[in-house]
């Protein structure tokens, strides 16, 4: 901000000086009297020609200066919104404050459209109008915040163009000034609150997503830990949280763990999907026609060719000779490691690409904004907030059989976000097996990104996932599910290495025998569960992840049960129930 100001000041000063110089040179080099007795060269140097040369030089210099000033100002016009220095300096300018107070942005309503369920609204308290977020920390990773000093995040930033267009009907009762357009989103405020409260009760960092099929409308997207959007106005609190996001990102409430992004924009980190990724491997195998294999699983584990390293089952279980259905139901690592090798690197890469995975270090990162269905959001603004990091596998020619086998069970080089796993559950839960873009907006067309697997293959995968909750690894957790409800799913237990922190949230650093410092790393076991409900005619797909929550059946699956029951209570299964009755009749 200082450089453009200085250049503008210099331009103004030099412009004034230029005018004075023009007058001075014109007077100094005015035509001499006709009777001056001097050689022609002297008369020429003292006349109009010299004046023209002076003016030409000054014009060129002034033009260069103007181009420089224009360039700097143009830079700030296009880069202002993404520059923290510019955003924070707005607070010092009274003109910006008056401009902001002259009009209001639109309200953001949940899918019901009811005022009492608004996600973002205004409040008129004795003539003082303030923007508030009724769900608070339960939805701040969605709603975001809006502040003079620290900018905006979430919906406030992603839909800012829509929210500032002057058509709000709700704000007219609050203010006579210019008002923005209202926005109704796909979120169900009641389900959103329920999801967040379930994560908080888990007592560990966690995330959950619920999608409404077939259009993948986001019903709930919760992340914990969280923060109250009102804290954004407290500069010391916000700076402390921002600093933590830089130094201890694993602990930061600013991270939207459902997406793997920061609420203010930008990527954060990935997760390993664990055994939930066997859903992908099973789907690829079924669709590729190699699902009838019987593999032997031994006490010593399965050693991929040329690796010398074995892959064993959780807790040392030995399943013996086993087929796909039982292997999926009991989450047999050895079976799926062998199945992944049977499907083969190239075919796995093909199916992974259908889900927009990067499968090689040489792959160019795809534009993750393509994974969303947008109508009212500005793509660039939306992408900076809600576009999850590129999902990754390593299925390049350099990948060893061990690498391929390990990735087939959701470990190794598999890098995913929670929403990616929800989308996989959606793809196999949909009747046509399509990979569909999620959306926060209502009334849009279903955006099919790719045909992941055939409808017949999807039906077979759903059958496998139904077994998991009936008599497999999730049967204990789903024993408490309302008997009128059915579901399908897959548990996951994922090993991951993270930074170790002290009680104050600082990374623990140690010094090795050579005097070099290292950040201490520890292993954690994340708990996962993905799936759909009802089982016969899915209406929702979901994914739940609890960091360091242990086995998927112990932490994530019970949360999924509660989400299914809440979704049913809110009426999202009524169409599916009627369809089931029609088929039986």
Identify the residue ranges that each predicted region occupies.
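Periplasmic/cell-envelope proteins involved in peptidoglycan metabolism and beta-lactam response
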Residues: 1-248, 253, 257-275, 290-293, ...
């Amino acid at each position: 901000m200082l450089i453009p100001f200085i250049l503008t000041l210099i331009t103004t000063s030099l412009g004034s000086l230029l005018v004075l110089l023009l007058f001075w040179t014109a007077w100094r080099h005015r035509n001499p009297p006709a009777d001056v007795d001097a050689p022609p060269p002297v008369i020429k140097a003292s006349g109009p020609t010299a004046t023209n040369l002076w003016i030409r030089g000054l014009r060129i210099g002034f033009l260069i200066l103007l181009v420089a000033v224009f360039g700097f100002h143009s830079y700030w016009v296009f880069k202002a919104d993404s520059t923290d220095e510019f955003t924070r300096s707005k607070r010092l300018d009274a003109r910006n404050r008056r401009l902001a107070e002259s009009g209001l942005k639109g309200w953001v309503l949940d899918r019901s459209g009811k005022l009492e369920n608004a996600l973002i609204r205004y409040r008129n308290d004795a003539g003082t109008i303030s923007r508030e977020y009724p769900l608070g920390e339960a939805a701040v990773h969605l709603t975001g915040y809006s502040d003079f000093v620290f900018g905006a995040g979430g919906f406030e930033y992603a839909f800012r163009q829509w929210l500032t267009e002057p058509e709000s009907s709700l704000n007219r009762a609050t203010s006579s000034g210019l008002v923005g357009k209202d926005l109704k989103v796909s979120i169900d405020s009641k389900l959103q609150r329920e999801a967040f409260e379930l994560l908080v009760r888990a007592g560990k960092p966690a995330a959950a997503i619920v999608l409404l099929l077939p259009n993948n409308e986001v019903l709930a997207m919760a992340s914990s830990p969280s923060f109250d959007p009102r804290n954004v106005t407290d500069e010391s609190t916000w700076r402390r949280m921002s600093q933590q996001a830089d130094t201890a990102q694993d602990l930061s409430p600013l991270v939207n763990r459902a997406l793997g992004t920061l609420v203010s924009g930008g990527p954060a980190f990935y997760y390993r999907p664990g055994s939930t990724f066997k859903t992908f491997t099973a789907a690829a195998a079924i669709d590729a026609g190699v699902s009838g294999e019987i593999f032997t699983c031994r006490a010593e584990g399965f050693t991929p060719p040329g690796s010398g390293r074995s892959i064993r089952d959780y807790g040392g279980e030995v399943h013996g000779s086993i087929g796909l259905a039982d292997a999926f139901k009991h989450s047999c690592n050895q079976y799926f490691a062998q199945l992944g090798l049977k499907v083969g690197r190239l075919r796995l890469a093909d199916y992974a690409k259908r889900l927009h995975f990067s499968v090689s270090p040489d792959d160019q990162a795809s534009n993750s904004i393509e994974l969303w269905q947008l109508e009212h959001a500005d793509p660039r603004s939306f992408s900076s907030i809600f576009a999850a990091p590129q999902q990754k596998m390593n299925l390049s020619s350099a990948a060893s059989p061990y690498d391929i086998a390990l990735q087939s069970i959701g470990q190794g080089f598999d890098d995913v976000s929670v929403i990616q796993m929800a989308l996989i559950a959606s793809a196999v839960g949909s009747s046509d097996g399509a990979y569909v873009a999620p959306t926060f907006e209502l009334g849009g067309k279903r955006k099919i990104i790719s045909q992941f697997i055939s409808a017949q293959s999807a039906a077979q995968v759903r059958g496998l996932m139904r077994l998991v909750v009936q008599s497999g690894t999730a049967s204990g957790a789903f024993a408490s599910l309302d008997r009128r409800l059915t579901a399908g799913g897959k548990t996951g237990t994922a090993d991951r290495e993270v930074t170790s922190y002290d009680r104050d949230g600082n990374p623990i650093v140690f010094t090795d025998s050579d005097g070099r410092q290292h950040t201490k790393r520890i292993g954690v076991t994340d708990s996962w569960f993905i799936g759909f409900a009802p089982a016969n005619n899915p209406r929702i797909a979901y994914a739940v992840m609890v960091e360091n929550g242990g086995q998927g059946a112990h932490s994530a699956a019970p949360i999924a049960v509660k989400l299914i029951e809440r979704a049913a209570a809110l009426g999202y299964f009524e169409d599916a129930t009627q369809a089931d009755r029609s088929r039986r009749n």
